[in-house]
């Protein structure tokens, strides 16, 4: 019999790194469910927030939760490590809460350099127009902890994940994860292109189905280490069996149905704008939804009704 994470949390003194949207959400939850909570933010602006971490404060902290975007080499993070205080990402914290209060809820995740927000909004449109009890959260929609604690619980959460968040997270597991593309943009934070790729790969390693851009050499290089059985590629070319792609003016699924069969996911003309990168986004969104059993009819309806903000 494992002791409950939430039961243990009641006696924990929690430090939140970051007083932004995520930090505020976490604080609201922890003020009820933890022993005590303190927020550290260098741009201290709320009451009850501190801007500097001192040894005195560290001596009264049991666990730390880090908001997105905090670097691993930040001095505060270093202090926490030296004090042997466990550090959780907000994703892993929310996952542990979910595991107790909504054990049936399933997560899908999405990462990539460009197009994440549009793609996750397409997924949200498929949920909405297919009457799926799910929501998009993280960088779009509500925070992950708010989505997890929503009553009644959602069946599905679709998370837009940055490399920052993936690098910090070890516990969360996904029904499906998608890698849209990899451009060399966040190298400063990760230190090298290699570690940036590794952060992206982390999502696919902990996903049952790994959806990846078959037209992106960087992305395909990153997934070489994965079990090929679980990889589903999306492509702007004609899809082979086990992939999703384009056949003339149709988006077609040859991955989530019987061998040799194909189903239409969307008409090209229903994607607005039907420019290549946006068609790729639609294929990724469709594949994520097909991976959790959403019908191609519902996918089609969601894409048709989606317009860019």
Go through the PLM ranges and name each one.
Residues 1, 153, 238-239:
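Residues that act as N-cap/strand-start positions at coil-to-secondary-structure junctions
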Residues 62, 101-109, 243-253:
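Short, surface-exposed amphipathic charged segments that create phosphate/polyanion-binding patches used
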Residues 5-12, 17-19, 190-194, 229-309:
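Adenine nucleotide phosphate-binding catalytic loops in nucleotide-utilizing enzymes
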Residues 44, 92, 141, 171, ...:
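Residues that form or immediately flank small-molecule/cofactor binding pockets and catalytic motifs
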Residues 19, 42, 112-113, 139, ...:
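Cofactor-binding loop segments of dinucleotide-utilizing enzymes, especially the Rossmann-like FAD-
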């Amino acid at each position: 019999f494992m002791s409950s994470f939430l039961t243990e949390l009641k006696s924990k003194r929690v430090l939140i790194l970051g007083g932004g949207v995520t930090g505020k959400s976490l604080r609201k939850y922890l003020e009820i469910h933890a022993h005590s909570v303190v927020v550290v933010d260098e741009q201290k602006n709320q009451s009850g927030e501190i801007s500097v971490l001192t040894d005195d404060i560290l001596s009264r902290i049991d666990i730390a939760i880090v908001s997105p975007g905090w670097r691993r080499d930040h001095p505060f993070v270093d202090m926490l490590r030296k004090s042997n205080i466990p550090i959780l990402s907000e994703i892993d914290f929310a996952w542990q809460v979910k595991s107790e209060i909504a054990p049936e809820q399933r997560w899908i995740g999405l990462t990539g350099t460009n197009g994440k927000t549009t793609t996750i909004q397409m997924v949200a449109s498929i949920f909405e127009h297919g009457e799926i009890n799910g929501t998009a959260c993280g960088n779009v929609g509500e925070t992950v902890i708010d989505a997890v604690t929503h009553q009644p619980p959602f069946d599905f959460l679709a998370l837009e994940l940055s490399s920052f968040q993936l690098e910090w997270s070890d516990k969360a597991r996904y029904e499906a994860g998608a890698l849209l593309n990899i451009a060399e943009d966040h190298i400063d934070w990760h230190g090298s292109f290699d570690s940036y790729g590794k952060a992206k790969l982390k999502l696919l390693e902990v996903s049952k189905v790994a959806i990846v851009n078959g037209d992106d050499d960087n992305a395909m290089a990153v997934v070489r280490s994965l079990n090929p059985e679980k990889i589903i590629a999306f492509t702007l070319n004609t899809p082979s069996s086990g992939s999703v792609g384009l056949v003339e003016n149709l988006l077609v699924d040859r991955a989530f149905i019987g061998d040799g069969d194909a189903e239409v996911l969307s008409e090209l003309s229903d994607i607005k704008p039907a420019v290549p990168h946006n068609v790729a986004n639609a294929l990724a969104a469709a594949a994520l939804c097909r991976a959790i059993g959403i019908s191609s009819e519902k996918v089609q309806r969601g894409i048709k009704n989606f317009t860019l903000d």
